[in-house]
């Protein structure tokens, strides 16, 4: 399905129905994690610009500091015009209920459209003894939430959530670097009439070709990507596809994606940060992928005194393994840190050129 802005005009942006929720939205949505890093005035202007540009789906979370508050201020008085999804990482029903009440107050609303278990490490079910799913059912009965949903980073948890038939949407990382297993997860959601909300569409900042990222998402008729935005220039890039039309996944784009996959497959850090904090204060989510950042972004910023000091902390790693127990991608983080540190030193010494 496509959106039409006027009689006789060409179709512009593909629209998606999120499974059994019945929620329809352009396949171009707003991830509100980054707005916690900007002022309230800046965030509200950005959110208004997103809405005026055609975005109607906004995803936030209790864990994103003041993101919910900013979303609430932006859409007060126009709640029925937007879809709001939020999340809680609570581990017991009482905390889950408290989080929901806080979210509702900050969002200035009496309900959220989609309420998600945040970064779940298990799939809650009725009768499992936790009371978590029953709490969600009660929230829904009270009209405080529209749909029960889940977000995950571990594919085994995501697959279990789909198979359970208990959730109306799944939020999971998806980009054109996806593995066959991850793409099969999207198809499983489609067969289960379950909406798929795609996070990490830029693979944690490693991908820079927005047109290719957007075109890849059009492969799927059940996927809504949420793009993390904190700058007007970033937003305008995504909004441009509302006017220009959904980019085609043509031969040129497919060839580009193939070249990117060849470079970036394997054990690379996505920068999600779930491994942190580190007992030795290492910025793992950047240090473990520094070699990629040096080569895929302007390198000068990563060679600053600040990042030289941060990379030096890698030498203090005691290989306690705590980070590996937290990593949803089961990466060998201490080895990645050492390899990136060694490469960084070679770059600093001028032995390796990164352009």
Each PLM stretch: what is its role?
Residues 13-15, 47, 68, 72, ...:
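Generic structural signal for well-ordered alpha-helices
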Residues 69-86, 134-142, 191-193:
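Alpha-helix-loop-beta-strand connector modules within alpha/beta enzyme cores
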Residues 38-41, 52, 91-197, 202-205:
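Glycine/proline-rich, positively charged
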Residues 56-61, 85-86, 146-149, 169-172, ...:
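Short catalytic-loop micro-motif centered on adjacent basic/acidic residues
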Residues 2-82:
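N-terminal binding-site loop/beta-alpha segment at the start of enzyme catalytic domains
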Residues 51, 55-56, 184-198, 202-355:
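Structured C-terminal cap/extension of enzyme domains
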